[in-house]
Regions:
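Bacterial N-terminal signal peptides
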Residues: 6-16
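Amphipathic alpha-helical scaffolding segments comprising HEAT/armadillo-like alpha-solenoid repeats
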Residues: 27-40, 61-74, 93-105, 124-137, ...
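N-terminal, post-signal-peptide region of Sec/Tat-exported proteins
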Residues: 42-86
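Short inter-helical turns and helix N-cap capping residues of alpha-solenoid HEAT/ARM repeat scaffolds
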Residues: 44-45, 76-77, 107-108, 139-140, ...
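Residue-level detector of extended alpha-helical repeat arrays and alpha-solenoid scaffolds
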Residues: 49, 81, 112-113, 144, ...
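Conserved hydrophobic register position within alpha-solenoid helical repeats
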Residues: 52, 84, 115-116, 147, ...
Length: 291
């Protein structure tokens, strides 16, 4: 873990930490965050819709986010539908199972596999196994389309960078055959490694990691900023709310959407902590009265 920390810290040196300031229009944080995501999922550009829907995965058991993802399952663009199907699993959207099962009949293989994966995550492995079986014996038509869609992603530098953000240090393409393809596409050799390092540190609660992530989130490379925000979300520490507030206005839409989902996630956690703290005196008084 110390090696991963040194990678992140070394490349983050000299990067100034952005000031912890509220959004420019003084909107409440959560209102600003929801507005960003709403604008993203309804954007006329499919790429932005994909990025906004993808960010929803950071909001588990959130009815509003779940409704947004479910609506995206019916998007006219297959990449948006696939992003929605992938997001619903990590969101713990058990009530979305019927909609995910319906998505198994989508004409685009990428959507089908995304839905099958989420069903597996949600505790319905039989659906995923059925899809895999049909592909194996050749009954599932259009399976080649999934391969084609993956090859198309190799031509998309942002998609490749996000693959690094999502899967960590041991991720494909940087640990497998696709690495050579990536090198032909991108001239940036360090950002993916730094992004992976940031994500890998998500579960390490050392205070030094907090400082490194706070610094990395203001990095000049968007992939590093996005990875740092993702790691901050996974740490579930409301103390980071003030730190990542400026990212709600990040010029990169991926960072902006990830930060918006992170603000909502941490705000919900903060509210839960405050409610729990408020209940403690009452519980103690009741216990004392019962003695």
């Amino acid at each position: 873990m110390s090696k991963i920390f040194s990678i992140l810290a070394t490349f983050s040196m000299g990067t100034a930490l952005l000031p912890a300031a509220p959004p420019s229009n003084s909107q409440p944080l959560t209102e600003k965050a929801w507005m960003n995501l709403e604008q993203g999922v309804t954007n006329k550009r499919a790429g932005k819709r994909v990025n906004a829907v993808h960010a929803l995965r950071l909001l588990p058991h959130d009815p509003r986010a779940q409704k947004m993802a479910e609506k995206a399952l019916a998007d006219s663009n297959a990449k948006v539908r696939a992003a929605a199907a992938r997001a619903l699993g990590p969101m713990g959207a058990e009530s979305s199972v019927p909609k995910l099962e319906a998505a198994l009949d989508d004409k685009e293989p990428a959507v089908v596999f995304a839905a099958a994966h989420s069903l597996f995550v949600l505790g319905h492995p039989e659906d995923a196994y059925e899809i895999d079986y049909e592909v194996l014996i050749g009954e599932r038509k259009g399976a080649d389309g999934l391969v084609a869609s993956q090859l198309n992603e190799l031509k998309d530098s942002k998609a490749m960078a996000m693959m690094g953000v999502e899967t960590g240090v041991g991720f494909v393409p940087f640990g497998g055959p696709a690495y050579e393809a990536f090198k032909r596409i991108s001239t940036d050799r360090t950002s993916p490694v730094r992004a992976a390092a940031a994500k890998e540190l998500a579960a390490d609660h050392d205070s030094k990691i907090d400082a490194a992530l706070a610094k990395a989130y203001s990095d000049k490379k968007w992939a590093v900023r996005a990875a740092a925000v993702f790691a901050i979300a996974k740490r579930d520490n409301p103390a980071f709310l003030k730190v990542i507030t400026p990212a709600l206005d990040d010029k990169n839409d991926i960072v902006r959407y990830e930060a918006s989902a992170t603000v909502l996630r941490l705000s919900a956690g903060q509210a839960a902590q405050q409610a729990s703290t408020a209940r403690q005196p009452a519980n103690e008084n009741m216990a004392a009265a019962g003695k």
